[in-house]
Amino acid sequence: MKNIFLIFVSVLLILSCSGDDNSLNNLMESEDFLKNNLSNPGVFEIEAGLQYEKLKTGGSGISPSLEDVINADFHGTLLDGSVFWSSIENGEPLVVTLAQLIPGCQKAISLMEVGDSWKLFIHPDLAYGTAGRPGIPSNSLLIFEVSLHSIET
């Protein structure tokens, strides 16, 4: 019986270590991507771990605050291009208080103006970190294309 228990514990340890390797690999890939991405024309850094590229400029002069409710389209992908969530594919923009979004989205979208479309590159520390989410492995860099349609104060 003692041997079965030891085998069981060993298997659990091996499985838990492989998950840590994936998490560490994701983190290293995220950091490498962000470092290299800054050399691309049109990519700017808001702060360490948060980059954007302007796809379309609205020019309204109106930006949301954290308390505002925004109406926006989001298309979220991982580094491998797989889509983890898309309001566009769902056929309906997201209407949400800006403060309810992940920190990277909060910071970037608060700088956008109504009518803008930006591509955001968000380090795991400003997203879901080591916790991950269904469809989002731990320590994953998130890429969002965001179109800010309106602000409801």
What are these regions (language model features)?
Residues 1-15:
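Sec-dependent bacterial lipoprotein signal peptides
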Residues 5, 17-153:
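Cross-family detector of peptidyl-prolyl cis-trans isomerase
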